[in-house]
Swiss-Prot record:
Keywords: ATP-binding, Nucleotide-binding, Nucleotidyltransferase, Transferase. The keyword DNA damage does not apply. This is Sulfate adenylyltransferase. Its EC number is 2.7.7.4. Disulfide bonds: none annotated. It comes from Populus euphratica. Belongs to the sulfate adenylyltransferase family. The keyword ATP-binding applies. It comes from the Eukaryota.
Length: 11
């Protein structure tokens, strides 16, 4: 999953 990348880009 890309939840970490999502949160990182959703900063």
């Amino acid at each position: 999953k890309a939840d970490a990348v999502f949160a990182f880009q959703l900063r």
